[in-house]
Each structure stands twice: as structure tokens, then as C-alpha cells.
Amino acid sequence: MIADGVLTLEEVARSDFNRRFVVTLADQSRVEAVLYRGDTLCVSTQVGCAVACPFCASGAEGLSRALTLPELCAQVLAVEALGLPLARVTASGVGEPLHAPDAVLAFLGWCRERGTPASFTTSGGPLPRLVQFLSAPHNGATVSVHAGFPATRARLVPKGPGLEALFGTLGEELPKLSRKRRKKVALAYLLLAGENDSADELAAFAALARPLGVAVHLYQHNAVASSSLHGATREAYERAYEQLRAEGLVVRMSSQARIEANGGCGTLVAAGTLRRGRDRTSS
């Protein structure tokens, strides 16, 4: 499927919950998009990612470039052209949305104008852009935290803002939002065996998260070839879920669509045309 010469879309895998697409851009860079549960499209915002999370395939090759607004919109239009009406869109694929602020903010506005609810997932930095995005016309903002201790955060989200600075910004900015808008903000915690799954780490995370009054997405890890990290066992995952609930948090478990090897969280990949040494983020 060709979308106005901006990109081509090829379906490469299908399962009970997800349909996975390779998106080839005009310069032959490639990213991926996923249709979850038949009505939610996860789009990519960059070719690669500079945040360098060790558990995620999207940034394994570094960052090539950010996508343009036409390239973001074309992902939506190309899927709809296949006869697949979309109930919602999320900018949660390859890339860090806050590293492509102009295009992604314009994309959120475009989605709103056409009546398609749009959300995004971010590692939270740069922090001034997080402040800007929280008040943007989104239908959901998920901030990936993955840690209760600063050292763990630095290890798992090495190019994102530090834990204390991140929660400091959230603690300052969330009270400025309306109650309705605050309910659209959530935190994400990916549970990794031997990395961030101890009771002490979870308690520390809960102590930071509780005052914010937002929900927590407790994610299961999807194995990827570029990472040696492993997800916690199902028993440990359920234990963490119960602990966070006992700590007073509203916790949501991973949906089946998000834990499939076919397009689940952290599995999307990119292939860019720029050398890794020329990695950059847009202004």
C-alpha cells in the first residue's frame, strides 16, 4: 500500500490480536507499525531511538532520524486505506516522541481534528518537552519509569531524565492539570528479572508514584534478540502486581496484545539510512 508517495506499508505478520506492518519511507528507511486488537494503531515517530533502553529492540541500532508530520499521518492513512477503521492511535512505536516534538505535537493535533483519539508513550525527556506534551491535545500520556531507585533508572533508561528529576517535574506539573486530564496520565513499569523486581525497588517506586494519583501499567517483558535481559516469572509478576496494589496504586496488567512476540511492546525494529555516528534528535 502506497500513501501519497510518502511511504509504503507491507503487512508482515498477523496473529489473533495483532497485525504487524513494515513501513518503508521515501529514503528507504524502515520502521514498523502495529494494529492492536483490530482498531488501535501504534505508529513509529523516529527511525531508531536515542534513549538506548537495553531491553528494547527499537533503539538497538541507535537513532537515524525523526519522522516528519506527513510520514506520521501517512501511517494512519495507509492502514485505513486497507479498509481498517481505527478507533484510536498511539505514538508508542519506534522512537521517543519528545525527541520529535514539532512533528508529534502537530500529529496529535491532526488526530484530534479528524476525531481520532491519540495517545503517546515517553521516557520523559527532555523534561521541558514533557511539560509541553502533558498539556497537548492527547487522549493519554504514558511515562515509562521502570525503576524505584535512581541507579536502576540510569541503567534501564540511560538517555532519559533521572528518576528524581522526572518525579520532581511530574509532581510539579500534574497538579496544574484538570482532574479529567490527569486521569489520562499513567506510569509504566516493565518488570525485569534481577533488575527491578525486588520488593524494595517496588516499594520505592510506589512511594514516588503514590502522591501523583495516576495509574500504573505493569508490563511484562517481551524477549528480543538484541537484549540479554529477561522478564520476571509469572509468579513474580503477579506478586509485584499485588504488592503495588497493596501500596495503594491503581495497577493495570499487560494486555495480551502487548505481550505478543508479533508486535508487542519493545519488539518493533527500525533500519535507517544514516550511520549511527550521526545520530541526532530534532529540535
Go through each PLM region and give its residues.
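SAM-dependent transferase fold signal centered on methyltransferase-like domains
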Residues: 2-7, 20, 51-52, 74, ...
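Residue-level signature of catalytic and energy-coupling elements of molecular machines
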Residues: 49, 216, 265
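Short, solvent-exposed polar/charged micro-motifs at secondary-structure junctions
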Residues: 8-13, 18-22, 129-131, 196-197, ...
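Classical nucleotidyltransferase
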Residues: 221, 244, 251-264
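Radical SAM enzyme core and accessory elements
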Residues: 4, 258-283
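Canonical Radical SAM [4Fe-4S] cluster-binding loop centered on the CxxxCxxC motif
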Residues: 36-71
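Flexible, acidic/Gly-rich N-terminal and inter-domain linker regions that tether
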Residues: 1-39, 43, 280-283
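Conserved AdoMet/S-adenosylmethionine-binding subsite of the radical SAM
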Residues: 79-243, 247
